[in-house]
Amino acid sequence: MAITVRRSTMVRPAWETPRVRLWNSNLDLVVPRFHTPSVYFYRRGPEGGGAPEGFFDGERMRRALAEALVPFYPMAGRLARDEDGRVEIDCNGEGVLFVEADAPDASVDDYGDFAPTMELKRLIPAVDYTDDISSFSLLVLQVTYFKCGGVSLGVGMQHHVADGMSGLHFINSWSDLCRGTQIAIMPFIDRTLLRARDPPTPSYPHVEYQPAPAMLSSVPQSVTANKTTPPPTAVDIFKLTRSDLGRLRSQLPSGEGAPRFSTYAVLAAHVWRCVSLARGLPSEQPTKLYCATDGRQRLQPPLPEGYFGNVIFTATPLAEAGKVTSGLADGAAVIQEALDRMNDSYCRSALDYLELQPDLSALVRGAHTFRCPNLGLTSWVRLPIHDADFGWGRPVFMGPGGIAYEGLAFVLPSANKDGSLSIAISLQAEHMEKFRKLIFEV
């Protein structure tokens, strides 16, 4: 599929913005150091309105983007380091990259169920990380126009700047301005609210920051990894309907006194079980599940509405594969227990624990974290991922524009609000073949 760039612009804030260095909290620094990829798809429909050339008009989008960058001014900055080498944001107003491109031979339908493959990643501008961290835009955007009249919006957002909730706050505010309405909630830009206590006093062991379990073997995994190339991976997306989810829940005990499980805990237990079975994990194999949780409402008092930054804490259920695969209730119980632990006391302790670590970069999760026998499952179900209406209608799909690591998965809500949930996941290719069958056994 050929994609040709029509125009590439560095969009700066429409008005003068504060020239400051923004301190990053520990939560801003234990995230992957690349741009989080996501892609929106929009179909040309009767609700689009306007002249054909007006659909996703680049000039209109650029003007609104420049306006949005005024209150969200850190997004227009660059990464920098303070005198101690700690990464911070230099709010210098240098701008964000906005690309307009054409895919004259492709249509939205060519992307099928929108699995986050390399084809999807091509809809997002590539970022060159070889130079200094101050060299690249913190936000890269690409509007791609297809032959069918539809478009995609590819977004790459540097993770130090924002988590999913804050990133969507920006994108949705930009779309509001483009549509002609005002920003509903202004961003709150002060990350010192997430400073550790003085002195730091962690009160939990914080297993979420301990190394992930390795495969049980007579040969250390690191030894075998050096002698063999990593096995090929596959990426796919699977849709579970509302009735599928109901059948899953029916497998759990009910009635008075029965444990209560969130929808996430039930679905996560099913995915964890299917992945463990597909991988053929022995029953005694420890396996760790990484569940990203938003701390905004868990902290007391809650953070101000519009807090802009990373507030992701991680719940990490840990169990032997035999327990995970024995039945849905056992896995769901382990997951729910870990989620219920994530209260204000635990989250404040996590901030303190991170403050005492000599090198936060050593705790950044990556391929070594999620690979077999472990799993990361991030839910976007409570995020407003379908609210970016730039004036030409809501997206028909929004999801990850690629999955960086084997063993990482995302739960996505349906754009048409039919109660279905989709799981986008990356696994070793041979494991994916088995997972495709297992995931629908509900």
UniProtKB/Swiss-Prot annotation:
One family from Pfam that matches here is Transferase
Tell me its EC number(s), please: 2.3.1.-
Keywords on this record? Acyltransferase, Transferase
Q: Which GO terms describe its molecular function?
A: acyltransferase activity, transferring groups other than amino-acyl groups; hydroxycinnamoyltransferase activity
Keyword hit for Cell inner membrane = no
Residues of the active site: 159 (proton acceptor), 389 (proton acceptor)
What superkingdom heads the lineage? Answer: Eukaryota
Q: Which family does it belong to?
A: Belongs to the plant acyltransferase family.
State the protein's purpose: Hydroxycinnamoyl transferase that catalyzes the transfer of an acyl from p-coumaryol-CoA to various acyl acceptors. Can use feruloyl-CoA and caffeoyl-CoA as acyl donors.
In Swiss-Prot or TrEMBL terms, this protein is called: Hydroxycinnamoyltransferase 1
